[in-house]
Amino acid sequence: METPKSCLTRFDRIPTRKGTRPSTICGPLHIQCSGSGDTKYVRGLITEVLTWPHVESTPPVVSSPDLISIHLKQAQGATPSSAATAVKEFAKVYLEAPAIYLTLPLVTAHWAILHGWAEPHYLASHGLMPAGTVLPYTPREESELEVCHFHFSRAYEFARESVEKKQPTTLSSPANASIFAFQERSGS
């Protein structure tokens, strides 16, 4: 698998964010109110993320420049009910707010929060979004962009791993063999 480029490779090696945490408005639309940098950093990051394997945005960035939902592509010819090919959103970005939502592995989310790079999403705190969904603070400079890039790459890897683990059992798999044996014995 092609992995996104980043010098940061481990969540426990992320530096502590400098300065105070930005102020945010907590609610269903959880947004950052202060401390955001130039949107060029986020726009550049989004452009790169959309080049990663099996990634797309809904709606396409050109039709909705303010709201970008980033997810894994649904496999060609897949049925919507198939767990293995379900669309897996791992990021949502509101460019004008500004706000980034990422669904991270719990350990990564923990370290992002602990080191001052994010806060738990309001709806995740109430069980209405997946655990590990955070509001990472938008990057103010190049060094912060690298940390934000790391968090996007972890969200991407987590989404890919989640989809791979949820593959449904097929009719020829050993898990279903007992069903067929029962049907044969009962005459069904």
Predicted segments, located by residue:
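Charge-dense, helix-prone N-terminal extensions
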Residues: 1-188
